[in-house]
């Protein structure tokens, strides 16, 4: 498992899957009013496919809950619109070198050593981004720290 760079915030962390087919890149939200605690993209390498993701805090029980979307419409959208473009949703965890799992922390926190997205691989295989000329390798559910974006 990878070790995050000292001083790297979650908002600047970049992760890779074990097969080198995906890159998960966090980017700053920079808004105290935002409902999300983190924003990220998941790039299917060697394709033009890039998915948008958000992590939101959820209470009872306390969880960091993520959503991964592809080509969602902008503006005033319905729940059906969001469901149609959602590829995956679920808990988002950090995993340290000891294998200890915790909720992914907000963007200002130190970068996690690994990010665990349970079930993301099977969800991608069942989605609109899977197939010839698209994603052909399903990511492992754990992505390891790769670098800190500048």
Describe the function of each predicted region.
Residues 2-14:
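N-terminal helix-cap/turn-to-beta initiation motif at the start of protein domains
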Residues 95-150:
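Glycine-rich, aromatic-bearing surface loops/beta-hairpins
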Residues 12-39:
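Short, solvent-exposed loop/hinge segments that bridge or flank secondary-structure elements
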Residues 1-3, 57-60, 69-73, 132-138:
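Short, intrinsically disordered, charge-biased short linear motifs at domain edges
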Residues 22-28, 51-53, 102-106:
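Broad, structure-driven detector of short, well-ordered beta-strand segments within folded domains
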Residues 34-83, 146-150:
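Central antiparallel beta-sheet cores of small beta-barrel/beta-sandwich binding domains
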Residues 15-18, 24, 64, 77-85, ...:
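Extracellular/mature segments of secreted proteins
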Residues 88-89, 100:
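Long, ordered, amphipathic alpha-helical scaffolds
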């Amino acid at each position: 498992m990878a070790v995050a760079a000292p001083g790297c915030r979650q908002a600047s962390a970049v992760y890779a899957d074990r097969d080198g087919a995906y890159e998960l890149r966090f980017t700053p939200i920079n808004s105290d009013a935002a409902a999300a605690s983190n924003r990220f993209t998941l790039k299917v390498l060697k394709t033009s496919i890039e998915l948008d993701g958000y992590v939101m805090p959820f209470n009872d029980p306390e969880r960091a809950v993520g959503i991964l979307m592809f080509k969602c419409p902008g503006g005033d959208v319905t729940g059906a619109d969001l469901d149609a473009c959602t590829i995956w949703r679920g808990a988002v965890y950090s995993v340290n070198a000891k294998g200890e799992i915790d909720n992914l922390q907000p963007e200002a926190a130190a970068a996690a050593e690994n990010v665990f997205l349970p079930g993301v691989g099977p969800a991608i295989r069942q989605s609109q981004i899977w197939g010839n000329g698209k994603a052909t390798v399903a990511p492992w559910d754990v992505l390891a720290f790769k670098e800190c974006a500048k």
